[in-house]
Amino acid sequence: MSEDRTRDSYNSGKSLRILVVEDHSETLQALSRLLSHFGHEISVADGAQNAKNMIDSKEFDVVLCDIALPDGTGYDVIAEAKRKKPVKAVAISGFAATEDIERGRRAGFDFHLAKPVDFHELRTVLGQIAA
């Protein structure tokens, strides 16, 4: 299968502008490469303040955000993002108990993915957002 056909099979909708916020460099790189391969436009931030600066300077369709960041929380990042413009928010977190997911929803997250991120689940969520 050609790379273009592979990319098309993974990108089940329009190309999205995605901000990935993750302090673990290997996870950040893996998500960035994968999402680029899916055909999305990716920006990255390694902490809450970097993410807020990017949100101030650029528009995003989706913010894919870790909850526990060294200089703040994903909850703060999403609150800032949603004040600027309606954006879909996807939590990526090692905290995946029912109460964690509910807290995320109350804070503004539309979806919650547990770490390690299941790439098929991520693709499904992005497909729902892009539809």
Region annotations inferred by a language model:
Residues 76, 96-111, 124:
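Alpha4 helix (beta4-alpha4-beta5 surface) of REC/receiver domains from two-component response regulators
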Residues 75-87, 126:
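Short amphipathic alpha-helix used as the core "switch/output" element in two-component signaling
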Residues 22, 69:
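Conserved acidic carboxylate
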Residues 66, 93:
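Active-site residues of response regulator receiver
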